[in-house]
Amino acid sequence: MMKRFATLCVATALTLTAVACNDADTHDADVKAVQANETQWVQDYAAKDTDKIVAHYTDDAVLMVPGTPATSGKDAIRTSVKQMVADPALALKFQATKVDVAKSGDLAYTQGSYTLSLTDPQTKQIINDHGSYVTTYRKQPDGSWKAVADIVTSDVPPPASTPSSSGH
């Protein structure tokens, strides 16, 4: 009886160790997949490929960038991205400094920094921006990761307001 109990204990310990190792392997694989997704996303922006850029978002994603209202849904994001990639001056690079995957394995987030150059539609001057971002990802049924929330904050102060002609 004691021998059977000892065998059961060893088998249980080995099973738990295997499960723990598998969880760690899955977590590491998910982190690498999210990192690879962001690397590909930067390449898609460099190629100015609207379809590939938008494919990184879920259908119900939200994009929040400085100076504009939140953009909700893939169709609205596509419209914004189309305008961006039409700009010959567009150059966007971003790099995650942190990637974290939830223990549940279905959500992840990245935070990092970005640099952006584009043409100001009003002044026609090139704007150089830099700042931080946080992107929340949801794991898809096919195992890929797509952004559900993409939030950008600029480190560049807004232009100084000019006094109005009414003196207010």
How should these model regions be labeled?
Residues M1-C9:
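Bacterial N-terminal signal peptides that target proteins for export
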Residues C21-A55, V62-H168:
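A beta-strand edge to alpha-helix "cap/lid" segment located at domain peripheries
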Residues T12-A13:
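Repetitive helical segments and hydrophobic/amphipathic motifs
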